[in-house]
């Protein structure tokens, strides 16, 4: 692939100025390249990188952005063809890059707070609550305190005010008050995402304030209920119109008339809500037709003259009517306003005149047919008048509750196609009717007096709820301040406070103005995932006249609603900017990531599924992915493989299974099917294209990623893949604590804390750590049945020693002896572990368990051992981070973990590298921003979350809170407000579900596979039932499927099925398997307008037998390959083997006498002179030990710090260690480094008990200061962010590279571990620094310098090698800083 060549749209995004710009960047459209290149162009135009703000979504994205900008600047600097002034300016910008604000919003807020904390009276010494569980525990502790106070001070019921006790009763169950606890914390989280949390909380009761006037004038009705019902009715009208068209096209005129009456009913209901405008009424007037005037009397009938007079007047009225309608339509076409009062007067006049004619006909006793004609005329006028009359709630409610739907007659006979159409129309009509009934039940159950009464009581509850939540929030904020901790949302609120100066603070206001002037350009990446508070912060840094905002995102990829991300911020600007209002919208639609099979398949799905109603944005031409990854075409062998849709039907051939097994069987079978397909890809060496070398390569396991919606399936997935011997790495394991190895460790930790816990104890005894059998466990219990199991174990030990065992006949004497030995060994370990738990850290305890039980190594040898070891390492790491928090000790750690489990918080295991040759599994959310050659979207039949409808209280940031109300008699009333909030939540969730599907599909580069599973005995999960739902796609001939089938979909697969059902490749015959036969709809031939011609997909259903056969064939192929290779072996292989065994000599004898682990400190001593004064002795005996034993380790252990004497004269090692600590901790971003500054830092470290005062007095302060006056030190001060201190590393080296005496043939690998004092990343490469306290004799300066350099050369060479491996860029300088001389001594070449 060549260098970056922007498309026209990318060029606009890079070069347009003078407007706020919103870039809608579809997946794979090169938005990062746009951001980087825009930054470079702005710099070329004279802006400075340190006067820009570039906000990213993650720290990794910020680092990536900074690195790319640096690389782009370096490229300009290194290009000698560029003018010198340009290169100099770019070089200057590289120097400024470290100080540039390229960070997450939280990092930027933290920087603001650290700089301006004094404005808001905040103590700058705080710790961030980065651990979610620690934050949760702290919240629960504070809420417990608050709720206890509220319980103690609970008041009696006061009229017009709810008490705390009523709040608890209303929102808690009969078992506990967890419901209220959860609601308070949920309200806190949502409020915290608002610019003014307390204001948001105070407004919560407003939805239940129906005012003193008409209910129809209330805010709730006008702003929530009315728009919601109007939207629903319009959806029904749209669906009915499509059904009318289908009925008419197939000659079903009677059915069409009935469905048309349904549509007219919806129009009438719409008009009752005030949803009909004057313009709508004019259009309906134009559609009205006067019927014939019947019932003419005979010529000799005396009533004939009256009839003729009425007929003449009616004809005149008809003519006047037509003229009036024409006039109003003309005004509409000319876009002239039509006054409602004017139209109302006209219609009233016509209605009165028709009423007069009707009265005259009745009084004259004209024929009934004549009277009927005039009644219809008058009724038509009255209905039009009613459309313009203000309704009441009760009349509306009655209209909805009493709506009648006609019976659909006219069923065709002897016409199969017409019968099928008629049947589908009836089914669709029934579905719409069901949706309408649900609408009525949810919103039109109460008359106005009932509605008001329930709302009043609910409002009282919400006032109390709001007050309690505000109380909790204030207490929690104060607790955090008292403990000097802040959470991420606090950073945002305090930053917002800094940027919002009071009116009476002119200096503060000037500071904010200066900040606004400082940032010449504000660029926001992933703008679609911004919340309202973050938006407010960023808007405070600009002003309308500056027009310096550049926002990049893709609302189709907004998938963080659960974190309070608000995609409507993006949508609002996008719609306004596209209309030329306030800014410029630019669309990046080219996809440089995926092959045409992925882009085409994605388009054919979303052009049928996504619009503003479902997805919140139209999938129009701009939104379509445009294939632009033309580099795939560089290799002619690179064939486009269609997207695969693989369906697994769990019991298509086995309907006898019990219900309880269905879900497990369904998922397990799907996972085996996936494993089969992966094995086919890998073992059949299916090819993919590698853009790096332009060649085709066989698919490897590491090329494949499985994307999932939920982590809950991971344990089952790992189990099935282990059986198939497919290597698997799972990212973010759900139910981490359910993994066997983790459960065993947690059980062991629990009994170390308290062994008198039966279940954990038995779990450990049964585990491989002890290895008791069920029979042995039972034998122990029989020794004493009346005590806990630990006491029974003690009884067994005592009885064995006293030879008084009970029920001894159950085991042989050998078995009893073996049991005693295992139990004795375990109890010995338990004693040691319990002692460690009391005296040492938790980390030490866990590592001791791994070491002394060998459990870490054991699980590594199990199937899936790689992942199991990662799980145990994660527990160790979690314990380490736990000990950095405010919680301490084993008991608290166990409580900590139990809380994590209660709240479904996982450790989020960081497994091995993604590039390892294993199949990787991650959530769709975890994959965002990544791309993979082969993507499986698995478990696509997993049901959507629709739990909101079951909650007593539901919360939405925009719609507010909706609750059920329980009266004094404990009767529960639902409220229309709650149903309105549920509707808003579900609408948002379905829109986000659709966007999550989009993200999943667009991760794929070359292959895309979608899988799902079904169960025929469960109606909602059966393939047959799903197939019927997918057939609803035929209800519309339009490309966009009707709203109802899309809204009522239950899973990703439902959406995929709806879109693909319109293609012949997705047919009943293709998908039927075993005893499940799907019926092809006769509507399948329906022509859909705009449907893509080449869908690029295949679909197939598998049964358990199909998967077994497929796996067997793969095994046969593998066996055949092995047999073929074996046949090429020489016939005398057996003789050769025997001779090899007899003559064998182990080639690494020397290595058996050498340790496989060496520290750099120890290796360094092999190179250095042994006469260093006051250092740890490396004496003759030790060197002899090296020669004879090959052990390169220091046997002199340091004296533990807690028993060191503080009065002795410090030795060089102590001073050296303390000096290194000062170098490590010294702040480098303060500018000037002088002796006073260094001394302050040393005293600070003494105060923190990190340095002994006696040792501190001997630290060479002048030597430290002098380092930062050297050329290297000055570079470090200019770029402190690029200087890395005390960096640990481990690497593996060959033995012959380290030690003499190890022959080349004895090339054993040795693990080297060390800590690098410091290194600086520069444009040219790395500068490696090592500090030394060595004494030099000034009379022999040159001699001593040469000696010191020779001593440490080997050590620095090892560091250099490690840095080359770690950083991937060369070490261009390395040297020793000698504190005694105050000089930086460079190593230039070997032997200098």
UniProtKB/Swiss-Prot annotation:
Q: Does the keyword Secreted apply?
A: no
Q: Which family does it belong to?
A: Belongs to the helicase family. AddA subfamily.
- The gene that this protein is the product of is addA
Recorded catalytic activity of this chain's protein: Couples ATP hydrolysis with the unwinding of duplex DNA by translocating in the 3'-5' direction; ATP + H2O = ADP + phosphate + H(+)
Cofactor list: Mg(2+)
Q: Where is the UvrD-like helicase C-terminal domain?
A: 623-929
Listed EC numbers: 3.1.-.-, 5.6.2.4
In what residue span(s) does the UvrD-like helicase ATP-binding domain sit? 4-595
Which residues form each disulfide bond in the chain?
none
Q: How does it assemble?
A: Heterodimer of AddA and AddB/RexB.
Where does the source fall among the domains of life?
Answer: Bacteria
Q: Where does ATP bind?
A: 25-32
> InterPro entries this protein is in?
AddA (IPR014152), DExx_box_DNA_helicase_dom_sf (IPR013986), DNA_helicase_UvrD-like_C (IPR014017), DNA_helicase_UvrD/REP (IPR000212), P-loop_NTPase (IPR027417), PDDEXK-like_dom_sf (IPR011604), Restrct_endonuc-II-like (IPR011335), UvrD-like_ATP-bd (IPR014016)
Q: Which organism is it from?
A: Limosilactobacillus reuteri (strain DSM 20016)
Protein task: The heterodimer acts as both an ATP-dependent DNA helicase and an ATP-dependent, dual-direction single-stranded exonuclease. Recognizes the chi site generating a DNA molecule suitable for the initiation of homologous recombination. The AddA nuclease domain is required for chi fragment generation; this subunit has the helicase and 3' -> 5' nuclease activities.
Please give the name of this protein.
ATP-dependent helicase/nuclease subunit A
Q: Which UniProt keywords apply?
A: ATP-binding, DNA damage, DNA repair, DNA-binding, Exonuclease, Helicase, Hydrolase, Isomerase, Nuclease, Nucleotide-binding
